């Protein structure tokens, strides 16, 4: 079954991309901090205008930038703002060990198959099956967005940004 894309992606010049991402933040009901499955959607509206949205328990955060990185930087800034969220939301990032996700401010869109969640200041780790939590997708095939979009996907995959 194909995933329903948000309404805002209907009028873009290029196909939208959707991925699930791991988030870490406080449950509004219980107050417990935990790992969440979030969603990131981005689309090249034109070759120089990228619109991105991150969805999670906090709702939707959207930004537009000249590149995927610029839009993502703006959203991370909002999620990490301690005046808006206490504690700030974090997105899990892959570290130098390919099987470990650390709490960080960057996004890794292509997960490994098994991972530990490493919480700063604690020795205990929570082991999660990332493939069960996230669905890795093949790199989409584009006409020409160009190569920037393909390169961005590869950058996310290789460097865990």
Where are these regions (language model features)?
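General beta-strand recognition
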Residues: 51-53
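Long, contiguous binding/interaction regions
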Residues: 2-48, 61-65, 69, 73-80, ...
């Amino acid at each position: 079954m194909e995933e329903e894309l948000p309404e805002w992606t209907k009028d873009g010049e290029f196909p939208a991309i959707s991925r699930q991402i791991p988030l870490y933040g406080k449950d509004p009901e219980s107050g417990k901090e935990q790992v969440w499955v979030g969603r990131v959607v981005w689309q090249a509206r034109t070759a120089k205008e990228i619109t991105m949205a991150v969805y999670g328990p906090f709702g939707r955060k959207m930004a537009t930038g000249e590149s995927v990185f610029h839009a993502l930087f703006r959203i991370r800034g909002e999620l990490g703002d301690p005046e808006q969220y206490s504690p700030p939301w974090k997105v899990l990032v892959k570290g130098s060990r390919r099987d470990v996700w650390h709490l960080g401010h960057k996004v890794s869109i292509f997960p490994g198959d098994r991972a530990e969640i490493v919480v700063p200041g604690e020795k205990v780790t929570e082991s999660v099956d990332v493939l069960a939590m996230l669905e890795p997708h093949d790199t989409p095939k584009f006409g020409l967005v160009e190569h920037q979009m393909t390169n961005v996907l590869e950058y996310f995959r290789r460097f865990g940004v």
